[in-house]
Amino acid sequence: MHLNENTKILGHRVILVPYEARHVPKYHEWMSNETLRELTASEELTLEEEHEMQRSWREDSDKLTFIVLDAETYSRDQDEIAAMVGDTNLFLHQDPDSQIPTAEAEIMIAEPYARGKGFGREAMLLMLKYAQSQPQLKLDKFEVKIDMDNAASLHLFKSFMFVETRRVEIFHEVTLERPITPDWINWLDQQVDLRMQCYQ
């Protein structure tokens, strides 16, 4: 999606930047890890296929992607590749039952050293806040689909007041949803400040 191609989002622990071609080799390295692929329901791709995927995500109007940087590492020498720790995505669609404009959210902290430090929580809060603040997206609801064994992600989204709505045993998957209401936006505003800069 072109919406965020010039947007950098600044948090305390993390910085979100658009997914660029220069990020692909490290992303590809992450996705060679079988456990990560299982947790994210991803297929193993060649480096060339990963580059094609990055280009397609940039062009597709229904996908919004940021790379998550460790803010402390980035502050040392502004090396984005060295600071990369994960990514966060939104997939936009109409809810098949209600036709409500919905965004399916994803967060991945790929670097083992970066887990358990609040990076995923802050990155996801920033992504949710950014998306709900963009009037052109016209979102009414967020949802997540999480592997039943991914206790950390289930706990994270329940702490964001997402509620389980569906459980599909055959896919070993749980769906949680969060309507975008004024009360929830107020809660979100208390969790993070949305600070943005122009990204070159």
UniProtKB/Swiss-Prot annotation:
Summary of the function given for this chain in its UniProt record: N-acetyltransferase that mediates the acetylation of the N-terminal residues of alpha- and beta-tubulin. Required for microtubule stability and inhibition of JNK signaling to promote cell survival during development, possibly acting independently of its N-acetyltransferase activity. Necessary for the stabilization of spindle microtubules and for mitosis progression. Regulates microtubule stability by inhibiting Spastin-mediated depolymerization and promoting Eb1-mediated polymerization.
Tell me what this protein is called.
Alpha/beta-tubulin-N-acetyltransferase 9
Pfam families membership:
Acetyltransf_3
> Belongs to which family?
Belongs to the acetyltransferase family. GNAT subfamily.
Q: Where is the N-acetyltransferase domain?
A: 34-181
Instruction: Note whether Transferase occurs among the keywords.
Output: yes
Name the enzyme group at the top EC level: transferase
Q: Which UniProt keywords apply?
A: Acyltransferase, Cytoplasm, Cytoskeleton, Nucleus, Transferase
Q: Where is the signal peptide?
A: none
Origin organism of this chain?
Answer: Drosophila melanogaster (Fruit fly)
Q: What happens in the null mutant?
A: RNAi-mediated knockdown in the posterior compartment of the wing disk, results in adult wings that are reduced in size, display abnormally thin veins and form blisters in the posterior part of the wing. Defects are mainly due to activation of the JNK signaling pathway leading to increased apoptosis in the developing wing. RNAi-mediated knockdown in the dorsoventral (DV) boundary and anterior-posterior (AP) boundary regions of the wing disk, induces notching along the adult wing margin and a reduction in the AP boundary region between the L3 and L4 veins.
Subunit comment for this entry? Interacts with microtubules as well as alpha/beta-tubulin heterodimers.
Where the protein is mainly located, per its record? nucleus
Localization, per the record, is: Nucleus; Cytoplasm, Cytoskeleton, Spindle; Cytoplasm, Cytoskeleton, Spindle pole
Q: What is its EC number?
A: 2.3.1.308
Catalytic reactions on record: N-terminal L-methionyl-[tubulin] + acetyl-CoA = N-terminal N(alpha)-acetyl-L-methionyl-[tubulin] + CoA + H(+)
Would you tell me the Gene Ontology cellular component terms? cytoplasm; nucleus; spindle pole
GO-annotated biological processes: negative regulation of hippo signaling; negative regulation of JNK cascade; negative regulation of microtubule depolymerization; positive regulation of microtubule polymerization; regulation of mitotic spindle assembly
Instruction: Write out the GO MF terms.
Output: microtubule binding; tubulin N-terminal-methionine acetyltransferase activity
What cystine linkages occur within this chain?
none
